[in-house]
């Protein structure tokens, strides 16, 4: 028997009639389902126990044989086999059709596979199949054309003309079946190949299409006549159940209705044929049978759908697979799980980073089996049943057992929407009272959670392996860095930031200034007793902190700091320098010398000579966390984060910062600024009335004036603000709010957008402190509503984008250590005009070099080939003045079905080299999709009249890039490398002509008159360079340049959109996605290979096909790279399971069946669908078949290695 859980591949083909008979356990002859009195299935009906198996385990229908000991016996009275009732989910029946019936998928799909096989138009097919015309099958000696159509009348006329039996013509699916049987595949294929040598245009396209389908039949071993059914399989009854409702009525699956119609019509047809009924009646019945089978397979595909009660269309077999509610997406890719719960979340500020609070009653329910096992083991109860009763009664002893059980048993917490992998993390449960789950405040950022009523789901990993993986790979304390950019994702926010900001403030002349303390305890004592303030600048003996990395010159001295900073530094890791200034120099190089007293110096003099430092803000805390992580990795960092959190909360509470209306300052010269603006607007309008400017110019000038007025108020606000003002502190520290919120409270609200998106000329002059007038209030409501609707629309759009991205990249996994490629990618900083979008330093970090990098002046080798570039190395390379470096890149990786470690570089989420088995495709998709909601929806207009092209930005632009659509505002590109020799304007046609002189000839390009030029006369341009502003069409670029240029261009474009919105994403994520769009080629000339011209295929398959031919000395095939949008790329994937579960399910399956496609189960989705463990991470073959080995000597493993590999030390198969 086949081991159901271990198979290499899965194939789908057309089912031959003999195959369907071999599946079947009997013929369904009657349309009855169950008897309304006995509620037992009817004999020979759709639920018959003889065919499909017994309804009760180990019991035949009449009850003669009961119990498992009769297993396998067939009852002599009722004919039912004694077996499990589960077989009713797997045993099929069949219906012998009295007339052949065409399968709607193959006749109606686009393109019609039947039509292509027979070289007939779908319309002609429809007329024949539905009995509207005859088709000539064999003309014999008559001048009739084979496959030509005859109407009823023409048929009779021709019969009279040529005599009966002089030619054969039929109608209905039977005729089509006869024609399909006559197709000689080999001959037709040879003929078409011959035709292709000379054909062109429309004729060639059609020939290529036909050749594709005929070749598919030829190679797969499917016979064309199997597209017409003589026998119809009946799916198992438990997959189309009938259930009794409370009121005694029945709810049945729609499929039963559809099968019933087929059986009724089939039986009626059989009776008519027995009675030798007139031809027209039989014909009508055959047509009705055809329609009934069509409705069963795909209701509504042709004509009006068959409806049930309340004119609701019935769900056919195709609908069971399609869409979000279909079998694929509803049951195979997303299942509901047991051992899960859901509750509102509340903040748990006392929790450690790896803990979460679980309510007692929830925990006892989730861990019930574990608790019951312990109760029995401790002999509090004799058996499981008694243990269960104990738990349900709420016996006092169960709580102690529960405490033991949950110790070291992690649980998973998930918050919807799960936009990236940090949306599910593992925690150790801590039992709490109440009914809300408690969440650690620092993980909120990763979950995007807040405590205004959010809910979260909790899941329990059951098996030992699942617990080990949760603990080692998913524990929240391990997820310090964000996979999308490698920056810390657990930065303190709000109160924590505010507390640490307040703590590290400095103030001149506060009580206790100039005191000198011997150590921290003395300073704290002075502060607690009111002798010194947190912000007072005081001295402390350096020797009281001997473990800090002081310079030799700083030891044994007194250092000037504040009491607050002494407390702040006390929680820092010991090896980190003493932080006195909030900057990177202090963090990486050590405390500046100016804070140390020379022997005999007066401390007050030194204090007076020092400037007052700004406090530590959110950004600085982020840098400290990143540095801590870089030096000490996860364990120390997560402990430090907890200390930072506690300190922040404690001091924000002590500071008691509050906000009242009096805290909003009044700007002294607001009236002057506004009067000046009114005056300026009046002048502009006067100039317009005199005809000195156009209306567009006037509009731009007026809105600019008001914008400048708002900025002037903002500037004044910043100048006059008091650093001790609580609102200013909140804003400045990065805890909440920004300058624009502040200026709306204290300055003016400024210009608002009108419903059409255009900015209104009338600004809102009031601020919120003064209060708005009714008209102003009305003006501002529109913006608020638009904000809400935009967000809602954006969320849906962004979610769909993520789904498509995941689908196209889900099979990209790190598959090997090094692919050994000799290609690389030359990179330099990404610029947009003069602005730098992404620096070279950022692009180099965490990548491997392809060639060694030399110092441009000294020629010294800075780093060898194939070396990992660290953060420090990247800085060193850039500081040396290097402008471009050749690195290993995903674009040039030679690994099949994935990427190798060296081409990928470091895993941004851990900061270490990526592991074999990491699902980098999915991570890339999440990293690009997750910030999608932060991107704007709008299409920007480039300032009024300046240009006629709207440049798309934000989310729509990202979609445009990844779907490889023709961009809005397309740039004209040159196909010639050379110099721009002339740009002439032609007023009559409103165009400009650009002439580029190349080596081989002159290129002439017509450009719209209004387009902004990117080149001037004398400029040197490369092939594919843009002559005008705008986006280049990537497909056009691919024709002019090569694949790598297109990949580099798309990468830069994606980065421009995200960086302009302040979102950072690692290059490698975009590289993974873009590579997936360019993994196919189209065969142009097959040479001596047996490839077909026009075929789309994977680059690796194409090179394989050529390899053998080249070795044997033949002519290799030629091809052209193809750029596909992500949706198209997902549907063109080699895995039909993955494609079918994505979109257009019926089309994908139709095509796969004809080709007899094999799915080798390489990606993640395919394996989830068939219920196998995914081939990534610990599910990879090399980590699974492991031989345990004894350790000879005691090995010491450092912390970074104690991750997945330590548990799964793997032997490759």
Curated annotation (Swiss-Prot):
Keywords from the UniProt entry: DNA-directed RNA polymerase, Magnesium, Metal-binding, Nucleotidyltransferase, Transcription, Transferase, Zinc
Residues noted as binding Mg(2+) in the record, renumbered to the chain: 450, 452, 454
GO terms classed as biological process: DNA-templated transcription
Textual note on the cofactor: Binds 1 Mg(2+) ion per subunit. Binds 2 Zn(2+) ions per subunit.
Residues involved in Zn(2+) 1 binding: 60, 62, 75, 78
Gene Ontology MF, one: zinc ion binding
Pfam families cross-referenced by the UniProt entry: RNA_pol_Rpb1_1, RNA_pol_Rpb1_2, RNA_pol_Rpb1_3, RNA_pol_Rpb1_4, RNA_pol_Rpb1_5
Names of the cofactor(s): Mg(2+); Zn(2+)
GO CC annotation: DNA-directed RNA polymerase complex
Binding site for Zn(2+) 2: 819, 893, 900, 903
Keyword Transferase among UniProt keywords: yes
EC number: 2.7.7.6
Subunit field text: The RNAP catalytic core consists of 2 alpha, 1 beta, 1 beta' and 1 omega subunit. When a sigma factor is associated with the core the holoenzyme is formed, which can initiate transcription.
NCBIfam families: rpoC_TIGR
Family: Belongs to the RNA polymerase beta' chain family.
Known role: DNA-dependent RNA polymerase catalyzes the transcription of DNA into RNA using the four ribonucleoside triphosphates as substrates.
Name of protein: DNA-directed RNA polymerase subunit beta'
Organism of provenance: Streptococcus pyogenes serotype M4 (strain MGAS10750)
Lineage, top ranks: Bacteria, Bacillati, Bacillota, Bacilli, Lactobacillales
């Amino acid at each position: 028997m086949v081991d159901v859980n271990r198979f290499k591949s899965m194939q789908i083909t057309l089912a031959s009639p003999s195959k369907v008979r071999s599946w079947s356990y009997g013929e369904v002859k009657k349309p009855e389902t169950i008897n309304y009195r006995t509620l037992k299935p009817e004999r020979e009906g759709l639920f018959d126990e003889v065919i499909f198996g017994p309804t009760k385990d180990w019991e035949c229908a009449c009850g003669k044989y009961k119990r498992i000991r009769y297993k396998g016996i067939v009852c002599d009275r009722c004919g039912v086999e004694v077996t499990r009732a589960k077989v009713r989910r797997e045993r099929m029946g069949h219906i012998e059709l009295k007339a052949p019936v065409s399968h709607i998928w193959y006749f109606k799909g686009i393109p019609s596979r039947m039509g292509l096989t027979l070289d007939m138009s779908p319309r002609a097919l429809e007329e024949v199949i539905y009995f509207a015309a005859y088709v000539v099958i064999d003309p014999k000696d008559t001048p009739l054309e084979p496959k030509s159509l005859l109407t009823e009348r023409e048929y009779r006329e021709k019969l009279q003309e040529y005599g009966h039996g002089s030619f054969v013509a039929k109608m209905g699916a039977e005729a089509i079946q006869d024609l399909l049987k006559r197709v000689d595949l080999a001959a037709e294929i040879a003929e078409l190949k011959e035709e292709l040598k000379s054909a062109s245009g429309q004729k060639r396209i059609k020939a290529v299409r036909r050749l594709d389908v005929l070749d598919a039949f030829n190679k797969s071993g499917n016979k064309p006549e199997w597209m017409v059914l003589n026998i119809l399989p009946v799916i198992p009854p438990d997959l189309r159940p009938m259930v009794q409702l409370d009121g005694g009525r029945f709810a049945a699956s729609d499929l039963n209705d559809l099968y019933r119609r087929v059986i009724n019509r089939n039986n009626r047809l059989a009776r008519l044929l027995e009675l030798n009924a007139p031809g027209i009646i039989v014909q009508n019945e055959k047509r009705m049978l055809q329609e009934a089978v069509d409705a069963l397979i795909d209701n509504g595909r042709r004509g009006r759908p068959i409806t049930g009660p309340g004119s609701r269309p019935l769900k056919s077999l195709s609908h069971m697979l399609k869409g979000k509610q279909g079998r694929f997406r509803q049951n195979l890719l997303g299942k509901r799980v047991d051992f899960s719960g859901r509750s509102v979340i509340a903040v748990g500020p006392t929790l450690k980073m790896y803990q979460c609070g679980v309510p007692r009653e929830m925990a006892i329910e989730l861990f019930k089996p574990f608790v019951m096992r312990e109760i029995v083991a401790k002999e509090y109860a004799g058996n499981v049943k008694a243990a269960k009763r104990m738990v349900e009664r709420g016996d006092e002893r169960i709580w102690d057992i529960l405490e033991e059980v949950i110790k070291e048993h992690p649980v998973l917490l998930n918050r919807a929407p799960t936009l990236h992998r940090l949306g599910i993390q593992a925690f150790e449960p801590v039992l709490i009272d109440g009914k809300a789950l408690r969440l650690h405040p620092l993980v909120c950022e990763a979950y995007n959670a807040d405590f205004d009523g959010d809910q979260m789901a909790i899941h329990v990993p059951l098996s030992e392996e699942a617990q080990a993986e949760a603990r080692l790979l998913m524990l929240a304390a391990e997820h310090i860095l964000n996979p999308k950019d490698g920056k810390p994702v657990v930065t303190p926010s709000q109160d924590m930031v505010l507390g640490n900001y307040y703590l590290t403030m400095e103030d001149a002349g506060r009580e206790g200034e100039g005191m000198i303390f011997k150590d921290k305890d003395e300073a704290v004592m002075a502060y607690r007793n009111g002798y010194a303030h947190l912000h007072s600048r005081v001295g402390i003996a350096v020797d009281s902190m001997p473990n800090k990395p002081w310079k030799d010159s700083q030891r044994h001295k007194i250092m000037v700091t504040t009491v607050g900073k002494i407390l702040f530094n006390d929680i820092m890791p010991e090896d980190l320098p003493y932080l006195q200034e909030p900057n990177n120099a202090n963090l990486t190089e050590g405390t500046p010398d100016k804070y140390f007293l020379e022997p005999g110096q007066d401390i007050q003099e030194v204090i007076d000579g020092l400037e007052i430092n700004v406090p530590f803000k959110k950004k600085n805390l982020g840098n400290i966390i990143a540095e801590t992580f870089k030096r000490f990795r996860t364990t120390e960092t997560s402990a430090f984060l907890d200390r930072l959190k506690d300190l922040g909360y404690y001091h924000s509470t002590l500071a008691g910062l509050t906000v009242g209306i009096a805290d909003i300052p009044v700007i002294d010269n607001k009236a002057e600024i506004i009067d000046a603006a009114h005056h300026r607007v009046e002048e502009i309008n006067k100039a317009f009335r005199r005809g000195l400017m156009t209306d567009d110019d006037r509009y731009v000038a007026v809105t600019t004036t008001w914008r400048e007025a708002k900025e002037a108020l903002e500037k004044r606000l910043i100048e006059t603000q008091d650093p001790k003002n609580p609102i200013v502190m909140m804003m400045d520290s990065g805890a909440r709010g920004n300058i624009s919120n502040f200026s709306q409270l204290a300055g003016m609200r400024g210009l608002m957008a009108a419903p059409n998106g255009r900015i209104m000329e009338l600004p809102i002059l009031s601020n919120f402190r003064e209060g708005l007038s009714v008209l102003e209030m009305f003006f501002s409501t529109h913006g608020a509503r638009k904000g809400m609707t935009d967000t809602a629309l954006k969320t849906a759009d962004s979610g769909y984008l993520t789904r498509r991205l995941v689908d196209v990249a889900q099979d990209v996994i790190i598959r090997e250590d090094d692919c050994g490629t000799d290609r690389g990618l030359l990179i330099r900083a990404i610029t947009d005009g003069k602005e730098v979008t992404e620096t070279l330093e950022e692009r180099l970090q965490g990548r491997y070099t392809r060639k060694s990098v030399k110092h441009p002046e000294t020629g010294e080798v800075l780093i060898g080939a194939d070396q990992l570039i660290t953060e420090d190395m990247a800085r060193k390379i850039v500081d040396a003045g290097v402008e471009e470096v050749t690195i290993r890149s995903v674009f040039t990786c030679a690994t099949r079905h994935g990427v190798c470690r060296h081409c990928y570089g470091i895993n941004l989420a851990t900061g270490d080299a990526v592991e074999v088995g990491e699902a980098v495709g999915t991570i890339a998709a999440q990293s690009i999709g997750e910030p999608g909601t932060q991107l704007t929806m709008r299409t920007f207009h480039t300032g009024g009249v300046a240009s006629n092209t709207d440049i798309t930005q934000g989310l729509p632009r990202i979609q445009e890039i990844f779907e490889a659509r023709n961009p809005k505002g397309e740039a004209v590109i040159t196909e010639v490398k050379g110099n721009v020799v002339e740009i002439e304007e032609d007023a009559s046609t409103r165009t400009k002509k650009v002439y580029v002189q190349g080596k081989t000839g002159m290129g002439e390009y017509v450009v719209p008159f209004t387009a902004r030029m990117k080149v001037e006369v004398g400029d040197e341009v490369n092939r594919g360079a843009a002559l005008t502003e705008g986006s280049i069409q990537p497909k056009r670029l691919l024709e002019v340049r090569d694949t790598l240029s297109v990949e580099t261009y798309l990468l830069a474009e994606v980065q421009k959109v995200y960086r302009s919105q302040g979102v950072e994403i690692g290059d490698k994520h975009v590289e993974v996605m873009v590579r997936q769009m360019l993994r196919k080629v189209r065969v142009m000339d097959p040479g001596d290979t047996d490839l077909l011209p026009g075929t789309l295929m994977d680059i690796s398959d194409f090179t394989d096909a050529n390899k053998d031919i080249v070795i044997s000395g033949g002519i290799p095939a030629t091809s052209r790279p193809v750029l596909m949008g992500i949706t198209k790329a997902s549907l063109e994937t080699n895995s039909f399971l993955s494609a079918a579960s994505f979109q257009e399910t019926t089309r994908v399956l139709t095509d796969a069946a004809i080709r007899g496609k094999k799915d080798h189960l390489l990606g993640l989705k395919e394996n989830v669908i068939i219920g196998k463990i995914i081939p990534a991470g610990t599910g990879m073959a090399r980590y699974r078949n492991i031989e345990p080995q004894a350790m000879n000597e005691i090995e010491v493993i450092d912390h970074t290695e104690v991750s997945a590999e330590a548990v799964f030390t793997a032997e490759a198969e």
